[in-house]
């Protein structure tokens, strides 16, 4: 591996997630985390939104690339993960840039009062289409992104399930297929799917 090495705190977070948390594979991991950090450094956003904190790995990666006066709002529905993530945020030199929220992103995000320069979507896969509608202001709600905003949606290939026949009761895969079609057919954005890890959909608002 010729990529930059993983920071010690992130390595510990990865290890503790695997030791203590159910479904540790949901963690972004070193390569995807470094990609997120570099994208933040290159794009220089002021306001970042993350939907789906999990144990905080990706939030810390993005915060590392964020300017000192930048803010990262991260939303997690599982309150049992709150203190686990917060304990690592407190130990990071970038933790002061992170604002943690517990609850439904569909309820919390519209109350934050920002338009976002960068959004990382990694929450409930069944809600990806609703997250997108919320961000784009569909249905008459306030638009939460602007021209030039970047949206990054994780797990977009869903272990290859999106190219296989979908069971009628597989709501996760159905929602991801709907999301991918929404992006492809929406003339307000342009996108590319990057087959890193479980797939990233990189979306730019025109």
Predicted regions and their residues:
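Class I SAM-dependent transferase core
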Residues: 1-49
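S-adenosylmethionine/decaboxylated-SAM
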Residues: 30-206
């Amino acid at each position: 591996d010729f990529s930059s090495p993983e920071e010690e705190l992130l390595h510990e977070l990865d290890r503790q997630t695997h030791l203590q948390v159910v479904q540790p594979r949901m963690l972004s991991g070193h390569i995807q985390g470094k990609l997120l950090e570099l994208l933040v450094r290159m794009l220089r956003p002021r306001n970042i939104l993350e939907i789906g904190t999990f144990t905080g790995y990706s939030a810390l990666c993005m915060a590392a690339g964020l300017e000192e006066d930048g803010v990262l709002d991260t939303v997690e529905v599982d309150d049992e993960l709150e203190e686990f993530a917060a304990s690592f945020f407190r130990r990071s030199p970038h933790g002061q840039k992170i604002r943690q929220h517990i609850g439904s992103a569909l309820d919390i995000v519209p109350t934050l009062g920002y338009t976002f320069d960068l959004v990382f979507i990694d929450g409930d896969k069944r809600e990806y289409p609703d997250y997108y509608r919320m961000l784009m202001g569909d249905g008459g709600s306030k638009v939460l992104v602007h021209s030039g905003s970047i949206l990054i949606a994780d797990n977009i290939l869903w272990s290859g399930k999106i190219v296989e026949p979908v069971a009628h009761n597989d709501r996760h895969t159905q929602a991801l297929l709907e999301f991918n079609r929404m992006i492809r057919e929406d003339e307000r954005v342009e996108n590319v799917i990057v087959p890193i890890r479980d797939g990233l959909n990189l979306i730019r608002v025109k």
